[in-house]
């Protein structure tokens, strides 16, 4: 299993106009390949501190894509950084299965 990130991680990446946020729901192997299960938020943030505040009050985040599956190659092409880890909820686990 890939050890870069783990389920429950909040990952951010930079866009032209600020930062966007993803949540890693699960990481699994599919026939030897790594598959990443993510949710995406519609919120954009001007800086990292704003992301940290939003994660602290997770109810303020708006999920735009509840579940997307990426191959390892597609995931690696997006440069993300981990900012926090919060256990995946039972509702989030249901989305993946």
Report the location of each language-model feature.
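Loop/turn positions that initiate beta-strands
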Residues: 6-10
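Short, surface-exposed secondary-structure edge patches
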Residues: 1-4
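Short beta-strand-centered aromatic/proline hotspots
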Residues: 18-28
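Intrinsically disordered, low-complexity, charged/polar segments
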Residues: 44-97
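Basic/aromatic-rich interaction segments and small domains that mediate binding to polyanionic partners
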Residues: 27-52
